[in-house]
């Protein structure tokens, strides 16, 4: 009798449906580039891992690195605006903000239509919001910031992200130093090992059925957002 019950239990376990794991998504964003060898190393690492990210590019750097700007676009990454000069937009007039975006727009690869503006430093104002709305841009914030620009300690950068990241987060990183790039690639490896899918911000919004609103800010897109 005991043997029969054991066999029955095994059969039940075989036919019981396996509960699917909840999908986990994170968007990685990179500010201030392109930056020559560091952006190139980051793009190589993203390509090797089959991962796409969102790049918030400065116009004056796009001017200096047109080939890298084109490569970012060609390899399926998302491009957003980060101003032309990287000056604080908070106290700029609408006219000056619009001029910054128009200068950057002229340097974008053909066919690239940004969906986001991330003001330098995240500093926003009514003028920033009004210009973003007029140019059909959502304002992109973030929910995880390891302050990678302030340290060369890759382990500290990685810990600051991996300790705090949750599904739906938008992570702020930079491609301006070797330590930032090495940390970013290690973070990606760790997230992939934890079954996260790393996506662009636009892709994350689509997965969350979130309609991007011009002139409105987003900082994270958790489930049911």
Predicted feature descriptions by range:
Residues 48-53, 62-63, 179-225:
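C-terminal domain-boundary segment and adjacent tail
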Residues 19-107, 113-114, 186, 197, ...:
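Active-site beta->alpha N-cap acidic-glycine motif
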Residues 9-14:
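Hydrophobic core
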Residues 1-4:
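Positively charged n-region of N-terminal signal peptides that target proteins for export
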Residues 31, 46, 79, 117-120, ...:
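Divalent metal-coordination and catalytic microenvironments
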Residues 38-41, 87-112, 121-167, 180-186:
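Alpha-helical scaffold elements lining the catalytic groove of polysaccharide deacetylases
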Residues 30, 57-60, 81-83, 119-121, ...:
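A cross-domain feature marking catalytic cores of carbohydrate-active enzymes
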